[in-house]
C-alpha cells in the first residue's frame, strides 16, 4: 500500500511534473492523492489532470480570512487521504493554524542553500551577494519562513556571468531531483527529527 501525498501549488508545476515522472519511472513509491492550487488557472492543474490526479482549487479571495482559506486547504488534503503535504511552488506563507495540524508532515523545496537567502527571489539574492555556490533545500515546514529542519540539499556552482534566470534554471534541475528523493526517504520511513536535525536512516 503506497503512502499518499498531497501536492500544493500556485503556478506552472514543474516540481509536480518531476514527482509525476519519478512515480511513472518507478523511482518514487507514493501516490499523489490530490493536487491543491490557490489559482484556478495554474498550469500545474493541467499537469495533474493529464496524469489522472484529482485536483482541488482553494482561492484566497473566496474566503473571509486566512483561517478559512487554510481550513479549506486542510479539508481538501484530508478528504483525499494525504499523509504528507508537499509544497511545490506554493507562493503563500502558511500560518500556525495550518502547520500545527500537520506537524512534521509538510515539506517545502526552496531554491537556496538554507539558512542563506530565505524568502522570495532567493536566486537573485545569491547572484547579488556574489556567492560561488548556490543550490536548493528540501525542509520540513515550521512557523518561520524557510526555517524548518533540513532534509537534504543539492549544490550548484554560480558562474561569473550568471543572471538570476540562468542560475534559477540550473538550480531547478537539482530541485527536480531533490524533492522526489526527499519524498522517497519519507515514504521509506527513513526520516526522524530531533530538535533542528533530520536524521536519515541508512
Located regions from the model:
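Non-catalytic terminal and connector segments of soluble metabolic enzymes
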Residues: 1-7, 37-53, 75, 80-84
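Short, surface-exposed acidic-centric catalytic microdomains
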Residues: 30-68
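Charged helix-capping and loop-helix junction motifs
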Residues: 68-74
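Conserved acidic residues
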Residues: 33, 83, 104
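Donor/substrate-binding cores of folate-linked one-carbon enzymes
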Residues: 22, 88-197
Amino acid at each position: 500500500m503506497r503512502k499518499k501525498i498531497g501536492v500544493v501549488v500556485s503556478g506552472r508545476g514543474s516540481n509536480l511534473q518531476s514527482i509525476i515522472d519519478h512515480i511513472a519511472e518507478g523511482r518514487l513509491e507514493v501516490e499523489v492523492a490530490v493536487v491543491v492550487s490557490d489559482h484556478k488557472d495554474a498550469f500545474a492543474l493541467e499537469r495533474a489532470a493529464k496524469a489522472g490526479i484529482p485536483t482541488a482549487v482553494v482561492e484566497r479571495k473566496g474566503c473571509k480570512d486566512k483561517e478559512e482559506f487554510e481550513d479549506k486547504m486542510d479539508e481538501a488534503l484530508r478528504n483525499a487521504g494525504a499523509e504528507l503535504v508537499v509544497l511545490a511552488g506554493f507562493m503563500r506563507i502558511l500560518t500556525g493554524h495550518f502547520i500545527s495540524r500537520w506537524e512534521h508532515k509538510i515539506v517545502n523545496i526552496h531554491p537556496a542553500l538554507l539558512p542563506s537567502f530565505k524568502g522570495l527571489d532567493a536566486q537573485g539574492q545569491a547572484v547579488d551577494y556574489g556567492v560561488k555556490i548556490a543550490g536548493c533545500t528540501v525542509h520540513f515546514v515550521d512557523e518561520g519562513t524557510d526555517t524548518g529542519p533540513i532534509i537534504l540539499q543539492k549544490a550548484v556552482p554560480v558562474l561569473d556571468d550568471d543572471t538570476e534566470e540562468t542560475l534559477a534554471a540550473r538550480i531547478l534541475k537539482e530541485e527536480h531531483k531533490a524533492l522526489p528523493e526527499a519524498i522517497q526517504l519519507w515514504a521509506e520511513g527513513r526520516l526522524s527529527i530531533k530538535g533542528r536535525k533530520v536524521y536519515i536512516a541508512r
